[in-house]
A protein has these predicted regions:
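Acidic, serine/threonine- and proline-enriched intrinsically disordered linkers and terminal tails
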Residues: 2-35, 139-159, 287-471
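Extended, charge-rich low-complexity regions and/or helical-solenoid scaffolds
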Residues: 2-5, 481, 485, 489-665, ...
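Elongated alpha-helical scaffolds that mediate protein-protein interactions in large eukaryotic proteins
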Residues: 30-41, 48-59, 63, 67-85, ...
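Buried hydrophobic core positions in alpha-solenoid tandem helical repeats
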Residues: 44-46, 83-89, 121, 126-137, ...
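Short inter-helical turns and helix N-cap capping residues of alpha-solenoid HEAT/ARM repeat scaffolds
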Residues: 52-53, 94-95, 138, 159, ...
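Alpha-helical solenoid repeat architecture
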Residues: 58-72, 86, 100-115, 158-179, ...
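Fungal eukaryote-biased detector of long internal structured cores
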Residues: 114-116, 122-353, 357-373, 441
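Eukaryotic acidic, Ser/Thr-rich intrinsically disordered low-complexity regions
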Residues: 300-304, 308-309, 336-341, 362-363, ...
């Protein structure tokens, strides 16, 4: 059972990204009057981007910024007109105002467009002007820092806003491809970013936050950036100071985010150089956990209640003149309701980031059951082939009966691990539980615009909040799964009494979360499936800690079998379902449930084998479940002729094992374990045959 690692390539590159699933498609899109208005508005905007008048070019860039924010339909229309190429040209405009607005528009495109549009920007040469901006911004920033009175406040504000836009674009590009990352590495961006963090007291939090986010992303598995940070003691001291700073009453969501990002960067560059004073600090226990744990107490239910209240009773909306007659747009003109919604979303994103870092901490905890077996060579395989006849006749003495049936003892856990488990499980479960806004309706086309929804009986929807909530649920479940996996336990033998009660108590809430996810009908099925997989991982971890004690219900078994047998289901999902079932089957008071699960696990190898990894797990669990022939439910294995089925499956199992591609990622480890399972099956069959029961 593998832990969920933090995978940069798979992580959504931008926390502001809202899924496109709520956009009308096909005939619905064509029939939408608002869609027709957008088409009419796009053409004059594109024309004015190339106007000879500075005011018109500025207006057009600002209009793009406003139109595309959380509005994928308009963004796609503009993309079709090559808005990316037109805006990149405007970065070289003779007017600084046009350049600033163009950078803001490109920044918003990065945020809302995702990987594809970032790749388009990179391919169309956006790095060339961005590289030229870095020294210019550095020079102006230094001038303002040295002499704050050297420039009016409005000019300073424009410098900070422009810097934030450029940094955000670079951050998004860095996660687009290795090619883009290498291009960013070549411009030595780390000193530029660290300057904002070092001078954070004198600068707006928004630009410091952008610099911290970019630094965090660049330091993920990126040796050039890591080395650049580790080489300067001032940088490390700055990151430690930010991470350990005490929260003040005036801190907002960005202040929290900056601390969490600095902590994440410290983890990315660890271990710290031995020559530095900070090298002796245990970053996880001394910095990360004290910083992150209090953040997990944030109530999603309260946040959703505030969002719904804001959506239901918003202030009087601002006038919305036709775009064709509008004056210069101002993206900062936000209503109080919009500011509330953005504040809550930022808080959710900080929470998601904290969970991401905590997941990494749990992923790096030592595995309780390391694999130490060596690969079986060809000579051993030939010996196994010669064992088939002996196994069928039950005359093999290769495995002693006591060895075959000896259960593992309960692994020990230190008191700090137990305390951490007891503290985090309730917090993570609360963050894993779906809210009324976690999954939007398939017919919901609401965007971030505030509208009076009091006339309808349906709950108000807000896609940005929904997107953030789903991300929090996934991160919390993955973190919970890693936490449970890091706790020493085994698939057989006695369970650890120190955490048994908390695991048993957590099981109903975790199962309820999965059931809520499965019965929901969101517009974004991929995201729901992602949450479901994460929930199964957490349930597996809980089931292992409470193995044989959790009382299984028929609903549990039926649901897990249904998920595992779904058409096109991923092997990893099957593995999780099989793992949960294997733990549920070991409750000695539920003999009928055990019978149903045993028959299902045997179906993975007989009459025809299923996918390799789930089959290996099913066989391994069958051995664990029926290792003690004196158990109350052993009659189920005997009545199902389990020994004969396993004996007859040895040739099939051998083919599965040999079919594992060791060249693929994880192939070597899977082959080692598969060889172990095959050997265990052979020994188990021999042992059961000798019992003559």
């Amino acid at each position: 059972m593998g832990k969920a690692q933090k995978k940069k390539a798979m992580r959504r590159h931008n926390p502001m990204r809202v899924p496109d699933s709520h956009i009308p498609k096909g005939l619905d899109s064509a029939a939408s009057s608002s869609q027709k208005d957008k088409v009419e508005a796009v053409l004059p905007i594109m024309q004015k981007l190339g106007s000879t008048e500075v005011a018109e070019r500025t207006w057009a860039c600002a209009a793009v910024s406003n139109l595309i924010q959380n509005d994928p339909g308009t963004r796609r229309l503009l993309q079709g007109k090559n808005v990316v190429g037109a805006l990149i040209l405007r970065l070289a405009d003779e007017s600084e105002e046009v350049v600033a607005e163009a950078a803001g528009a490109l920044r918003n495109l990065c945020i809302d467009g995702g990987f594809d549009i970032c790749a388009e920007m990179f391919n169309k040469g956006v790095m060339n002007p961005l590289k030229e901006f870095i020294p210019k911004i550095s020079g102006r920033l230094q001038t303002v820092l040295d002499d704050p009175k050297s420039a009016p406040e409005k000019v300073q504000s424009l410098v900070y806003e422009f810097a934030e836009n450029v940094i955000t674009i670079l951050w998004c590009l860095s996660e687009t491809s290795n090619k883009a990352l290498n291009a960013i590495n070549s411009i030595s961006l780390i000193p530029f970013l660290m300057a904002f963090l070092i001078n954070r007291v004198k600068l707006p939090t928004s630009v410091v936050h952008a610099a911290a986010q970019c630094l965090y992303v660049l330091s993920e598995d990126n040796p050039p950036a890591i080395q650049s940070i580790r080489s300067e003691s001032e940088y490390i001291a700055c990151l430690v100071a930010i991470s350990t700073a005490q929260q003040t009453p005036n801190d907002n969501e960005r202040d929290m985010g900056i601390r969490v990002l600095a902590c994440g960067t410290l983890r990315n560059i660890s271990p710290l150089p031995a020559t530095m004073n900070a090298s002796s600090i245990d970053i996880d226990r001394s910095i990360a956990l004290p910083l992150i744990t209090p953040l997990l107490s944030y109530s999603l239910q309260d946040a959703v209640a505030e969002v719904q209240s804001t959506l239901t009773e918003p202030p009087v909306p601002l006038p919305n003149p036709s775009l064709k007659h509008a004056k210069l747009p101002k993206s900062d003109d936000k209503s109080p309701a919009e500011m509330i919604l953005e504040r809550i979303e930022r808080r959710l994103r900080v929470l998601q980031l904290a969970l991401e870092i905590l997941t990494g901490i749990c992923a790096q905890m030592p595995d309780p059951e390391p694999i130490e077996e060596e690969m079986v060579d060809e000579e051993d395989m030939e010996e196994m082939e010669n064992d088939d006849e002996i196994i069928e006749n039950g005359d093999d003495d290769a495995m002693d009966a006591d060895e075959a049936a000896a259960p593992n003892g309960a692994p020990e856990a230190d008191s700090s691990s137990i305390s951490l488990l007891r503290t985090l499980i309730p917090l993570l479960l609360a963050l894993s539980t779906p809210t009324p806004m976690s999954f939007s309706s398939p017919t919901d086309t609401t965007t971030t615009r505030i509208s009076n929804s009091s006339s309808t009986s349906e709950a108000p929807q807000h896609p940005p909040t929904t997107s953030a909530l789903v991300s929090v649920h996934i991160s919390a479940l993955e973190c919970l799964s890693n936490l449970l996996l890091s706790f020493p336990t085994s698939d057989s033998g006695p369970v650890n009494p120190a955490v048994l009660d908390v695991a048993v108590a957590a099981w109903p809430q975790a199962w309820s979360a999965l059931r809520t996810i499965l019965v929901s009908t969101p517009s974004d099925l991929d995201r729901r499936n992602e949450v479901s997989v994460a929930a199964l991982g957490a349930l597996w971890g809980l089931a292992r800690l409470a193995r044989g004690v959790v009382v299984p219900a028929q609903e549990h078994v039926e649901t897990l079998v249904q998920i595992a047998d779904s058409p096109g289901v991923d092997e990893k999902v099957q593995v999780k379902c099989v793992g949960i079932l294997g733990s549920l089957a070991q409750n000695v008071n539920e003999i009928e449930i055990n019978r149903v699960i045993a028959q299902y696990l045997l179906s993975y190898i007989h009459p025809t084998p299923r996918a390799t990894e789930p089959t290996l797990h099913a066989l391994s669990l069958l051995i664990d479940i029926y290792a003690d022939e004196a158990s109350a439910y052993d009659v189920n294995f005997r009545n199902a002729h389990g020994t004969d089925i396993l004996a007859g499956s040895v040739p099939t199992l051998r083919k599965l094992v040999r079919g594992i591609d060791k060249r693929k990622e994880g192939g070597m480890e899977l082959r080692r374990w598969a060889d172990e399972v095959e050997g265990n099956v052979r020994g188990f069959v021999t042992y059961r045959r000798k019992l003559k029961i």
